[in-house]
Amino acid sequence: MSCTLDHLIAQWTRLGVAFSAPSAKESPDLERLLLNTARRAPQNARVFILAVTWLCRYGDLVARHRLKRLVADELELEYRPVLGMLLATVREETGTAHFNAVIRDCPPADEAAPLFEIERKNEKLRRLAERHAAPISRQWNLWARAFRPKDEALRPVRWILERNPGYRIRADLKGDLRASIIAALADDPRAGESEVRLSRCCGATRSAVRDSLDDLETAGRIKRSHVGRRRRISLTGMELKNRAHGRRRSVRVANN
């Protein structure tokens, strides 16, 4: 589901990005935040630059299997080039292969044009955007100048995890399939109704999901129970407590 630019900025503020804006009241669904960033970034260059900056430092928090599935299921075709360019810029800056599978599902725009709306609407700015476009932006047919990540605009990881305790397991799991399972159980309605449904939500095979569930159950992160002929999966009290703690903390911060 899409969101307004103001709400998007509030969510990034919650994740430690230095926007002059109030923070969101709850931790964002990180993978859907990236989809909404692709939708709204053309309206605001700072959003694009700081999203790249955040992912360069904290990209391992993203559950990459789930992101790939959400791109296929929820992100409109017109915004996939924006997400592809965003993630490819992160890859170029860091050398990470974390987002390769997602990038492959995000083709370049059909027609070359400026990335940012303000430059599309003005012929002079449009010509300047084309003239000064960075090589990577030309690959995506979305002209934009080269830039350097703004590391000074980010809070440290400790700050982020204190305010978003549900992200701690993301930090532990480095965005692998187990992270996608936890994120799906937390944010996708009915994901835990069966292994088949959970596999679809994570964009992975049932066999791979089952192996990851074994690991998560051993670690006390999830529990499985039989409901009729199905095997239902849910977060344990430990994970639910982490998420509830994050919501309570946001209320205290807002009231101070």
Residue ranges and their predicted role:
Residues G203-A219:
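Short amphipathic alpha-helical interaction segments
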